[in-house]
């Protein structure tokens, strides 16, 4: 049996710091280097729109990170949007850990299978309390909460109405405002 080499977080950081990966869109997921798909116009426009909307709603209550790494056990994915604890200067010397994350958002078109399977399992296993997938293919928001093991026990498929993140129950986020396509 042949086993794939698994990268540790420290080895991954050395590789990133060396510059070898500078021309590649990759991330570390469960010790494996995963090549990411290029973003199309729908993906990037949705990302920009949702980030601006979140910043309007949250102000300084949280930091909104766009496609920047987070550090989990044996993984350093770059979710499209990470809503993390303030202040921003906490992340000058490290990426946010699971304990810093309010919720994550992936915008999925070509990566829907990866986002709803492998990334979901990684996020759940690391205790990410809330994980949203903006499904560009099926025009819906899929909200995952209550992580247990490799999955989430609560899943909502939304196309209209409001959603309140667990970390901000007073916040009413319009689903249709995120699904502008």
Residue ranges and their predicted role:
Residues 1-181:
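Gly/Pro/Ser/Thr-rich low-complexity, intrinsically disordered segments predominantly at protein N-termini
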